[in-house]
């Protein structure tokens, strides 16, 4: 399975404290209509940290059901508890997801050996494609290129990484050590085009929740060798990318989708509504981009 192009780290809509299945299905359909290449439910943007285990499973199930095989579904299934990650990954496979996005264990701060053994343990019990999710700003631990190379060499299930450091030196080293068949996806919307230029294959995007066509078109243009179009779209996306991170993700992106009329503005504590000054900035940026 190739995970290439623009994948949306899709939000989880809530209504009255519960997952809003109707709006979620509508969002999925809109994403597909807009040409997105794949979807990632239950990631950071999907507020996986505040979903119950039953809700987590429901969100994956709904996403797979609604997609109906039209595009790949890469299900968020990671945990800092290895046994829990195994259970979530097993469910993702049974539900029909095409792969699992597995965050490096957070809070525990494992060594590189601990990271290696974590992913090895998951693969020993569930055989499906894994994308390792490296986001040190949230986990407190960076998985090194050498460790990824070891995983890639020893564990066939580890087919790529979502690299959210924005560090192009690290991206280059990953591709150098793992080879160009290893799938490196950007986890940083600001550096998608530079990552593609050194051999990355796509992005797992926050911004594409709002502008799926623009993000996927940029990836397609680059793949087709149309660098002028890719560069133009990169700069058109830049102010929207900044807007999506005015405050902690997914607060701005859920606010944007609510302004667009696509979801209710509801998130779970400890996330809270966007500050008024940032709401005004967000609205202005979206209006200038023709989104509102």
Curated annotation (Swiss-Prot):
Whether Transferase counts among this entry's keywords is no
Q: Which CDD domains match?
A: DHDPS
EC identifiers of the protein: 4.3.3.7
Extract the SUPFAM superfamilies matched here: Aldolase (SSF51569)
Residues involved in pyruvate binding = 45, 204
- This protein's GO CC annotations: cytosol
- Tell me, which GO biological process terms does this entry list? diaminopimelate biosynthetic process; lysine biosynthetic process via diaminopimelate
| Residue(s) at site: Part of a proton relay during catalysis | 44, 107
Any one Gene Ontology MF annotation carried by this entry is: 4-hydroxy-tetrahydrodipicolinate synthase activity
Domain of life, source organism: Bacteria
What broad class of enzyme is this? lyase
Q: Where do the catalytic residues lie?
A: 133, 162
- Supply the alphabetized keyword list: Amino-acid biosynthesis, Cytoplasm, Diaminopimelate biosynthesis, Lyase, Lysine biosynthesis, Schiff base
Q: Which SMART domains match?
A: DHDPS (SM01130)
What role does this protein play? Catalyzes the condensation of (S)-aspartate-beta-semialdehyde [(S)-ASA] and pyruvate to 4-hydroxy-tetrahydrodipicolinate (HTPA).
Question: Could you describe the subunit structure of this protein?
Answer: Homotetramer; dimer of dimers.
Task: Say which family it is in.
Answer: Belongs to the DapA family.
Q: What is this protein called?
A: 4-hydroxy-tetrahydrodipicolinate synthase
Which gene underlies this protein? Answer: dapA
